Amino acid sequence: MDASISNSINTADRASYITNESTPLHNVKLKDEGYKYIIGTFGIVTLIITIGLGVAINKDPGEVSFGSGIAADRSVCTEAGNEIFMKGGNSVDVAVAVTVCLGVVFPHLTGIGGNGVLLVYNHKTEKILMCLDSWPPAGTVVVPQLMLALYTAHSSFGHKSWSIILEPAIRIAREGFQVSESLIQSLKHLSPNANDDLKNWLHSLKLGTVIKSPQLAETLAVIQDKGVEALYTGSLNDELGKYFDSKSLSEPSLNKEPCSEAIGKGYRLISSGVGTAGPSLLNSLVDSNFSNSFSVQELADFLIGKEELSWPLPSGVVVSVTDKDDNYVSIVSGLGPVLGSQNLLKDGYIVGSLLHRSNLSRINSFGAPFIATTLQHKCEKRIVTGGVDLRDMLQVLPKILWGSEGVVNSVEAARVRITENSLLAEINHPPVLPFSLPPASMPYPVINVIQKRGDEVLAYDDSRSL
């Protein structure tokens, strides 16, 4: 593995360009496996609302390297991923390291106590290597299985040792990291029923100060040394045992449903499988008339009669990684809502939602990873991304795939948060409308994107990561 890497930077442009990809791609015949769902009509939104971005964003080239890219929520975790690249790691190694790191610096959104969905794909062979979903069936107890999913992916495809992969996150937890705006904003989601440890910790935080997480560092060190089994049946079992019975902890399992695939509008589209938002996402992209300029009405028409319209607003993080061997990885992880179950354990992490909404009989995960590759010219355009909420992805992906704005403007364009009863505007990305919308609570879901065109790579971090 080549040690040369790139930085997806968190500055004004937040983008990196990487060139000199050296390996030709193979051509294979693709299958057409679309997903069909019933789409009704929708009357909650009567006005056509076009989502747009009023100010163009200037882009400034970043570092040059050999086809590797990282798009993630925090620069400190991107640097952790770069560290793994420099040690000879591949995209799976890096994506796992970055995701674990985000559990340290964004503990209100993801971490050991959460779950996730991941997709691994190799573009040289055009083969899907892995789809994993750690969210259990809706209406059941949600045992935290994110670390199990990461460990499984790493065991299957990683190049470097598990110990090396966890080292950056452990170091950051021990040495400290800056309190982000996103973490401060999570106070707005604090429930009166939150445990005292979480309340006291959150109220002690100040924006921009450096804090340490020694308990979390020790927990990760145990997982580094003993493996993920320590969480469920080993020395770390006592804390989780307060919330989950021994049978649930002794029998963790991952959903290995096949990935969803579809062919449409010049692309091969790949996402996660049944039980996630993946099938509905691909169906919407293939069968819709979405373009680079579309209305909320068009999006709403897709949601009537679907469970997606009644989904709560989820939270989480998105990690997208590519390497010079054209391994593409997308990991979408979270705790459910911001702050999960509102229980901070003595082991230093927040437990995610303890129970899925029982009426969501079909969907376990509201988000999905996403990969798109052009059909006619395999090197023309490839997209690696994901999102924690289908409703956000449908406001961004059509622009990236078929619009003329480009990745940066598409990601930074205003979005509307859509719920069963209301439309909500993002505070820092307000839509241009003839009337005002109530504000959506921060922090907002991000969509971090890697785009490969020929031998050029653009890795872009959504500024909503704060």
Regions found by a protein language model. Give the residues of each.
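Structured, charged N-terminal subsegments at the starts of enzyme catalytic cores
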Residues: 231, 238-282
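Histidine-acidic residue clusters that define the catalytic metal-binding segment
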Residues: 197-223, 228
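Proteins synthesized as precursors that undergo proteolytic processing into mature forms
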Residues: 5, 9-202, 217, 233, ...
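Short, well-ordered strand-loop elements centered on a beta-strand within folded domains, enriched
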Residues: 125-134, 247-248, 268-270, 378-386, ...
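Residue-level detector of beta-strand structural context in well-folded domains
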Residues: 259-260, 317, 369, 448
